[in-house]
């Protein structure tokens, strides 16, 4: 089990990971609020934590992965009322859609996916504890607020100072009469007409968003656990508020390491509905194979901002297809033959990249070099070396959740045909024409066919077993 470093958002630097329990990692990631289809920003968070977990497990870590579902929220209530359906009908429909999208992207299911509505009692217990400790207070209207000035370390995750924030609060925060401080946040909301509610010591109502994650994470993983993650947009106020209410309630450190995934921009601008550049995963899958979306996400470091565009996805499509063609070229000669012997130099370089804050950009550079070596070994008919390189590449792409489809099925899909410009059947037909030309000693025609295919990105390689083809690197 190789030591690894990760960027801890709270410390604002890369640090070596030290588990609370030897060989075990407990991880909680903020999931979706299920009132609509998941967008490409959600896709990045899902895929990033998926390949992080896949890698850690490949290294021998026993990872317990919790990703919650927010199934009660202002947006959910509003959308259900607009649609004329119950909240449960709405949320179950979009939970199913979310799980389907995640599966299409090749993401492993979390070990547990707690729903907020299943933990109302635990949320009320935490709120009651905060009130009893003087860290929270009930307002006259039935709301309960967390008092931020009672938590001295408030702002330590985001690097914000409460005094600085308060100075401009009148411009940024709706100062409610019931609040003692403009940044006090709601733990329990009093019941309103036509909204779901639960009985509580403070009257009927429902939980605030922030308390949901604190209750679910600590119930599933304990008061103090290893890693908490989510999108960068959640750092403040959501994760900041989680720390405050959790530590004020338990008296223990909440989380050891915070991981935040960077933003996705669309054609250089921040993704937003108002700009009309907001795309759901399903929108994008109408044009691109889901594994191309995954490749696009994997190819950049998880903390870096990424520009989403058709051009970027087409580049991802071309690059991913090269791996499939290398696999096809190998399988045409050696079938599915693999070996447990791996090229340790490539494995070590790949692991070193991933152990440096899960640097997939560097890891992919290693895989491209390995892919080129595999193509060379197949071309030179070095059977033993080709088998080792193929087995190594398959092992490492599996860790990243790439090249997971049947080679022929993938290359016959729209993505494969677009990348090649020629279908498999068309290429095989050209190869047969070339074989016939060589038999007829029409070498000029044979050379012409080879050159024509090369210009269309198809490389022919003559071996003892016959002619095989692949996409040019």
Swiss-Prot record:
The keyword Ligase applies. Its main location: cytoplasm. A motif ('KMSKS' region) lies at residues 270-274. Binds 1 zinc ion per subunit. Keywords: Aminoacyl-tRNA synthetase, ATP-binding, Cytoplasm, Ligase, Metal-binding, Nucleotide-binding, Protein biosynthesis, Zinc. One of its GO terms (biological process) is cysteinyl-tRNA aminoacylation. Its cofactor is Zn(2+). Gene3D superfamilies: Cysteine-tRNA ligase, C-terminal anti-codon recognition domain, HUPs. A motif ('HIGH' region) lies at residues 32-42. It catalyses: tRNA(Cys) + L-cysteine + ATP = L-cysteinyl-tRNA(Cys) + AMP + diphosphate. This is Cysteine--tRNA ligase. The lineage of its organism: Bacteria, Pseudomonadati, Pseudomonadota, Gammaproteobacteria, Moraxellales. The gene is cysS.
């Amino acid at each position: 089990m190789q030591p690894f470093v990760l960027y801890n958002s709270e410390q604002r630097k890369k640090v070596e990971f030290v588990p609370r329990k030897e060989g075990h990692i407990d991880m909680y990631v903020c999931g979706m609020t299920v009132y609509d289809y998941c967008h490409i920003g959600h896709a990045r968070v899902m895929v990033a934590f998926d390949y992080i977990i896949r890698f850690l497990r490949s290294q021998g870590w026993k990872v317990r992965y919790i990703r919650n579902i927010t199934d009660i929220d202002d947006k959910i209530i509003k959308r259900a009322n607009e649609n004329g359906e119950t909240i449960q009908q709405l949320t179950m429909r979009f939970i199913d859609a979310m799980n389907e999208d995640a599966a299409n992207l090749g993401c492993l299911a979390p070990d547990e996916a707690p729903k907020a509505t299943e933990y109302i009692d635990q949320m009320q217990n935490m709120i009651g504890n905060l009130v009893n400790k003087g860290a929270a207070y009930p307002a006259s209207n039935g709301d309960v607020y967390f008092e931020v000035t009672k938590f001295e370390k408030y702002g330590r995750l985001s690097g914000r100072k409460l005094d600085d924030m308060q100075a401009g609060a009148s411009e940024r925060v709706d100062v409610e009469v019931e609040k003692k401080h403009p940044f006090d946040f709601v733990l329990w909301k009093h019941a309103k007409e036509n909204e779901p509610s639960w009985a509580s010591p403070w009257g009927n109502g429902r939980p605030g968003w922030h308390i949901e994650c604190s209750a679910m994470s600590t119930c599933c993983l304990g008061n103090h656990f290893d890693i908490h993650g989510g999108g960068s947009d959640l750092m403040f106020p959501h994760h900041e508020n989680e720390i405050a209410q959790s530590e004020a309630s338990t008296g223990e450190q909440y989380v050891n390491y915070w991981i935040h995934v960077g933003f996705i921009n669309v054609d250089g601008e921040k993704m937003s509905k108002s700009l009309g550049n907001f795309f759901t995963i399903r929108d994008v899958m109408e044009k691109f194979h889901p594994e191309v979306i995954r490749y696009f996400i994997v190819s950049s470091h998880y903390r870096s901002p990424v520009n989403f565009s058709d051009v970027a996805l087409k580049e991802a499509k071309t690059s991913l297809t090269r791996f499939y063609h290398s696999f096809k070229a190998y399988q045409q000669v050696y079938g599915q033959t693999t070996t447990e012997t791996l090229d340790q130099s490539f494995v070590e370089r790949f692991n070193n990249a991933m152990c440096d804050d899960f640097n997939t950009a560097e890891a992919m550079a290693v895989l491209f070099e390995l892919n080129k070596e595999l193509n060379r070994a197949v071309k030179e008919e070095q059977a033993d070396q080709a088998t080792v390189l193929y087995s190594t590449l398959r092992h490492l792409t599996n860790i990243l959740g790439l090249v997971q489809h049947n080679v022929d099925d993938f290359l016959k899909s729209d993505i494969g045909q677009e990348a090649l410009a020629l279908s498999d059947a068309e290429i095989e037909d050209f190869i047969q024409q070339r074989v016939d030309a060589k038999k007829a000693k029409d070498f000029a025609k044979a050379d012409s066919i080879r050159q024509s295919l090369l210009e269309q990105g198809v490389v022919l390689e003559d071996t003892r077993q016959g002619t095989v083809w692949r996409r040019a690197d």
